[in-house]
Structures are given as structure tokens and as C-alpha cells.
Amino acid sequence: MKFSIITANKNGGRFLEETIRSVISQKESGVDLEYIVIDGGSIDESLNIINSYEKDISKIVSESDQGPVSAINKGLKLASGEIVAWLNADDRYHSGALKRVAQVMAAYPGKALCFGACRIIDEEGREIRKGITSFKEFFFSYSSQFTIQCINYISQPAMFFRRSAIEKAGHLREDLEAAWDYDLTLRLWRQGGGVYVPGVPLSDFRWHTSSISAKRYATQFKEEFDVAVKDAGWPTPQILIHWLVRWGIVGTYTLMAVTRMMRGAR
């Protein structure tokens, strides 16, 4: 079972090497890996880092683009593996993650995607926001089209999908600012549903001040609501639940942001 993993980067040199190493180390467990790196014309140390791993990267593209979604879509067009995913240039896989994914996808050939646990880490790699992680993991055992319409509990760095499924569902929407991964998850789910990869986390999502999730969480949750409405229809029970969850999460994130600002002002 061949994997195609895509990393889109632009001036992400600070964490990029850790990301690359976490991907190429998956080969140690015998995984057939195609690694595609799309760089949007970085002016920091990114290209030096990428070129230093040239022998381990299958395809390197370095040219200007319209942002991360455009870059990932470029990678999706180049992907030739049966199982596809993207890993942002500040996130990382855990050891043996792809081997576990391969085992689950082989056991469930009709499923369009699979997902697992994903830790949230800070800039130093320390786990944070364990409550949010536990909240998402609560829904894993109840995964269905209904529950994924209620709440986006699948963390993108821990989601993998069949290339045949995305060819039917279509690539990422470039008109969305932040919820393009959730929109794709909903469309992929309609191609065969998803299955949970049990056990320890597959990946780490890095939360830092320049990440999309940190800067645009209000926009993200509004867009997530809009794409859920498009997928589930209105009015429906799952959209009412999504609306309630959305405002609960936005309120929590806002309170956390205010608390950080107050601490910084002391």
C-alpha cells in the first residue's frame, strides 16, 4: 500500500525540518512512501532545509502560489499513492503512524478515510490543551455522517484518505479561508465513510501565534458551520447541535485569548 504525503510550506523553516524528519522516518517501518513538498517561494531557510533532504523527498516544487490550499491542491494532483494525506510544515507524525494507518485501511477496504488521535503541542513541542483533545476523542466511537456534521472532531494531521475517494469528492476549495479541511472531510465521508485508527496518537498539531487556527478561529468556525449546513441541509438536528457547539468553542477560545492578553499585560 503506497502512501503519498504532501507538505506545503512558505517561510516555515522554524519547524520544517522536524516535519520532514517525521515523514521520512515512516520508511523505517517498511512503508512505501511518496513524499511531495510544495514550497511557495520561501525566502527564509526553508529551501536549504528541503534541499538537504532531497534524496528522501520524491517530488519538490518551488514556485509562487496562492496560499496553502493552492499548494496542497498542487500536491494532490501529483500524488500517485493509494492513500493520501498532507502534513503542514509545523506539524509532525509519530513513529509508526503510517504503518498503523495501512493496517486499518487494508482491513476496511470500503472506507474512504481513516483518522486517529492527534495531540496539540506548543512551539516547544509540549502537549497543551488536553481538554480539547479529550473532547474530540469522545466522538471517535460514535463516528458517522451525523456526528461529523455536528462537530469537526477529526484533526487534519491525523486524517488519511484514499486517492480514489478524493478523485470523486474533488480537491480542496480555494475560496475558503480556514475550513477547507473540514469541507473536504464531509465530502470524503460521502464516498464511503471513515474508520478510527485506535491506539496512541498518530500525529501532533502545533498551535502557535502564526498558525491559521490561532489567527482565524472565529472565521474557521463560521465557515465550518456554513459547510455543515451545505452538507446536512437546514433545518436539521445536527446543524442545531453544530451551532450550539460552535458558539461554545468560540466562547472558550475567546476567553483563552483574553486571559493570555491579560497575563501579558502584567
Question: Which residue ranges define each predicted feature?
Answer:
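Conserved donor NDP-sugar-binding/catalytic core segment of glycosyltransferases
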Residues: 96-130
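Glycine-rich, basic loop-to-helix element that forms the pyrophosphate-binding segment
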Residues: 46, 63-79
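Short beta-strand/loop segment that forms part of the nucleotide-sugar
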Residues: 32-41, 61-64
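Conserved nucleotide-sugar donor-binding catalytic segment
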Residues: 6, 137-223
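A conserved acidic beta->alpha catalytic loop
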Residues: 39-48, 88
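Short aromatic/hydrophobic "clamp" motif used to bind/position activated sugar donors
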Residues: 84
